[in-house]
Amino acid sequence: MAEKSGVTGLDFEFVKTPAFPKPDFDKLENVGVPTTRYPAIKNAPLPADGSGSDTFNNYVLISILTIVPWWLSWKVGGGFKTTLFFAIIVDLPMLAAWWLTISAISPRKNEKVRLPNRGVEHYLEFKKEADRAKYRGTNKIPMETFYEMYFDGDVDFKGDCLEVMEQRHDWVSFRFTIGLIKFFLFGMMPEVIMHTRSQDEEQVRDHYDRGDDFYGWFLGPRMIYTSGIISDINREETLEELQDNKLTVVCEKIGLTKGDSMLDIGCGWGTLARFASEQYGANVTGVTLGRNQTAWGNSSMRKVGIPEEQSRIVCKDYRDIPVPVGGYKKITSLEMSEHVGIRHFSSFLKQVHDMLDDDGVFFLQYAGIRKAWQYEDLTWGLFMNKYIFPGADASTPLGWVVDKLEGTGFEIKHIDTIGVHYSATLWRWYRNWMDNRDKVEAKYGKRWFRIWEFFLAYSTIISRQGSATCFQITMVKNINSTHRIDGVETQFNLHGALDNCRADLQSWAAKNNVKTPSELL
């Protein structure tokens, strides 16, 4: 089957998501705030807040960066050029010093959550005596220092990674480090400024063409790398149920009907394209830069009898998307636009607007961040940019996205925030990953396993607590001739979309809950 389909590396199995292990630490009673007990998610045992934007003053920082070079220039009798010279020399060191100092001395946002104060050594096992002596008791280790040491094998968790990370406020500091600032200034920012086409291609293919088994070992048989949707908070739905819920929600929110021309930008392994084609009769074009994903998506559609004339996956840059006469009736983009970058975001939206039929619908699922940030959020974001999604610099607060969408000419019909749904999805991905530990380490090494272990565990927490989140935004063109009345019956929230489901999810699940990729391809 691998030769016939053009897909390689199918000699792996999907696992059934295992139960979460018993917590390694005694249950914390009366932590100071109410906690939840829902089966659908990994409930937070210690939901503490840290310091952040409420104690950070941009005006003071800008004043320092402006006044100090001017004062130095004045002292030597210089003018504007001399001031500019001193700014080049002293502003970066002052900026770093400011970040290091303020992030270290700022108090927690509130003290509502009572920390157990067990000491760093209760949670971490350092390999070197110097580290054991340095980080113990209340002398907490900076988060960036910790994860770099963890990836290098210089420290281990005393227990399950996710469980120890849940207690992180008791053993870690979120103050900035020299390494974090260095990466931001000289690693991330140049990419944000440049963000070239070749950079996009290199980063996407390095990430997504690593190996289908690498992703299959945590994504499961749906091979969907975006948030699922919870339909019932009082039971633990499977990962596959969460993803099937999401597929349904997308198709119902856009009012998909048989024969609709649909474009899925950043389609991944093509599961949404196949679902929309098979369950709704749509004519779908999926676009991805991943070669492995292209082969997988086309093979899976041919397997179930969807002809290429109806639907296909193409391996192209989004800037080269083929457009049919009249445009696409429905356009979807799930967690791809963040990779476009801040520099190109408006031009990307303009392109989508131009490709969309005047009475069409655009659905954007967008991973964003909160505006009232905490230092933990920034530390996590820089980790993600360095190790997981390099170049995905357009993860922003909702207001920024809405402003760009409306400025491009879209009218927003509905917005749902699905961060906690993402946490539920990540929790299941994490358990799959841990269950495949031996296989991952044997093929990709312990370092790659640890990076993804940390990513999946930490992101389960981050998306649950609001540091990062995800938005579903449904839009039409904001022009006078748009038939807005046609969209009234499909102006759904999450549960409205699920209640209106026109897909045969039972049949879909029966065909797709498989043990090996070969059964799909």
UniProtKB/Swiss-Prot annotation:
Coiled coil: none
Name assigned to this protein: Sphingolipid C9-methyltransferase 2
Membrane topology label: Multi-pass membrane protein
Organism: Gibberella zeae (strain ATCC MYA-4620 / CBS 123657 / FGSC 9075 / NRRL 31084 / PH-1) (Wheat head blight fungus)
Effect of disrupting the coding gene: Produces 65 to 75% nonmethylated and 25 to 35% methylated GlcCers. Exhibits severe growth defects and produces abnormal conidia. Also exhibits drastically reduced disease symptoms in wheat and much-delayed disease symptoms in Arabidopsis thaliana. A double-knockout with its paralog MT1 is not viable.
Summary of the function given for this chain in its UniProt record: Catalyzes methylation of the sphingoid base component of glucosylceramides (GluCers) at the C9-position. Sphingolipid C9-methylation requires 4,8-desaturated ceramides as substrates. Glucosylceramides play important roles in growth, differentiation and pathogenicity. The methyl group at the C9-position distinguishes fungal glucosylceramides from those of plants and animals and may thus play a role in host-pathogen interactions enabling the host to recognize the fungal attack and initiate specific defense responses.
InterPro entries reported for this sequence: SAM-dependent_MTases_sf, Sphingo_C9-MT
GO BP terms, alphabetized: methylation; sphingolipid metabolic process
Recorded family membership: Belongs to the CFA/CMAS family.
